[in-house]
UniProtKB/Swiss-Prot annotation:
Post-translational modification: The N-terminus is cleaved by ribosomal processing cysteine protease Prp.
Annotated segments matching region Disordered: 11-34
Family of this protein: Belongs to the bacterial ribosomal protein bL27 family.
Gene Ontology CC: cytosolic large ribosomal subunit
Residues in the signal sequence: none
Domain of life: Bacteria
Keywords recorded for this protein, A-Z: Ribonucleoprotein, Ribosomal protein
Organism listed in the record: Streptococcus pyogenes serotype M3 (strain ATCC BAA-595 / MGAS315)
Gene Ontology molecular function, alphabetical: structural constituent of ribosome
NCBIfam families, per the entry: L27 (TIGR00062)
HAMAP family: Ribosomal_bL27
Name the record gives this protein: Large ribosomal subunit protein bL27
A Gene Ontology BP annotation from the UniProt entry: translation
């Protein structure tokens, strides 16, 4: 009588590991107000890292380079020299 020594193994290999599979959250950078749009004082106009766009008339720059309106008015994106851009807010006469 032959007794077979039957041994069962896993039929799939282990899952292994990878160093991928992560990504950072989107930071929602960019324009928050359009050219010609009316904004109130304190409104965020442009979120950025560094100064892609410079602050113009009645526009302030926050600690993280965010541009915001200092007064209520109309937004204007303008050229500053040959290769720079700026955003300004001009008050509307009532």
């Amino acid at each position: 009588m032959n007794l077979a020594n039957l041994q069962l193994f896993a039929h799939k290999k282990g899952g292994g590991s990878t160093s991928n599979g992560r990504d950072s959250q989107a930071k929602r950078l960019g324009a928050k107000a359009a050219d010609g749009q009316t904004v109130s004082g304190g409104s965020i106009l442009y979120r950025q890292r560094g100064t892609h766009i410079y602050p113009g008339v009645n526009v302030g720059r926050g600690g993280d380079d965010t541009l915001f309106a200092k007064v209520e008015g109309v937004v204007r994106f303008e050229r500053k020299g040959r290769d720079k851009k700026q955003v300004s807010v001009y008050p509307v006469a009532k």
